[in-house]
């Protein structure tokens, strides 16, 4: 019986792991599980799609589902959260938030590529409408929807790292007024020395 390889996380690392697993094992069942409803896409391109430099958010998607399912024989399970792993029985617990459905999936090999999460702050008002984190395509769509609803378009960005600075540029291209706040004295504090950061600023 072919072994089952389960990959948790459908970003670049997870997709790469699934495709390499296919190259090394032509007979295994490979299941790639992602919590978003889309296959792998370029997260770093999100601000550029938002600004219009890249034609659309969909242009960031690397491969369509047939490339996974038919070309590489990788089964996609999109829109599922991994809520538990039992290493003793080699089983993962999955939940689909949109309808609450739960499943268990046995594995012979498990690869974890869950990636990062957007940094958030637990400040009063951080849960109000109009407050966003930027990490996913859905985040960008919600921000675009919000900006289309309001007449005066002003955005405050907390953080002047790479994502915050790219979003500031994207918003300015879209004629949105931007205020960017950063705890460090200069922008891109973990990437550039102060002299270079001052030039970029």
Predicted regions and their residues:
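Short acidic/polar capping segments at secondary-structure boundaries
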Residues: 137-139, 161-163, 185-186
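Residue-level preference for nonpolar/small residues embedded in alpha-helices
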Residues: 60-61, 103, 163, 196
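Beta1-alpha1 glycine-rich phosphate/pyrophosphate-binding loop at the start
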Residues: 2-75, 168-195
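FAD-binding core/adjacent interface of flavoenzyme oxidoreductases
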Residues: 1-8, 61-62, 66-154
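Hydrophobic residues in beta-strands of the RecA-like P-loop NTPase core, especially within AAA+ ATPase
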Residues: 157-158, 181
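Glycine/Thr-rich phosphate-binding loops of Rossmann-like dinucleotide-binding domains
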Residues: 40, 120-121, 165-166
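Glycine-rich Rossmann-fold phosphate-binding loop(s) that bind the pyrophosphate
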Residues: 9-13, 135-136, 159-161
């Amino acid at each position: 019986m072919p072994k089952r390889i389960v990959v948790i996380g459908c970003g670049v690392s997870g997709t790469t792991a699934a495709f390499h697993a296919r190259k090394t094992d032509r007979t295994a069942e490979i299941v790639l599980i992602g919590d978003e409803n889309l296959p792998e896409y370029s997260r770093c391109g999100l601000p550029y799609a938002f600004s219009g430099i890249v034609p659309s958010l969909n242009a960031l998607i690397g491969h369509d589902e047939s490339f996974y399912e038919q070309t590489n024989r990788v089964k996609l399970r999109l829109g599922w959260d991994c809520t538990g792993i039992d290493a003793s029985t080699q089983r993962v617990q999955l939940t689909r938030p949109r309808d609450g459905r739960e499943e268990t999936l046995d594995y012979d090999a498990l690869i974890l590529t869950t990636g990062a999460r957007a940094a958030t702050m637990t400040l009063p008002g951080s849960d109000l409408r109009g407050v966003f984190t930027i990490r996913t395509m859905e985040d960008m769509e919600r921000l675009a929807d919000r900006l289309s609803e309001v007449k005066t378009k002003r955005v405050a960005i907390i953080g002047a790292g790479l994502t915050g600075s790219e979003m500031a540029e994207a918003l300015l291209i879209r004629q949105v007024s931007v205020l960017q706040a950063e705890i460090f004295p200069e922008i891109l504090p973990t990437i550039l020395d102060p002299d270079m950061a001052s030039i970029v600023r």
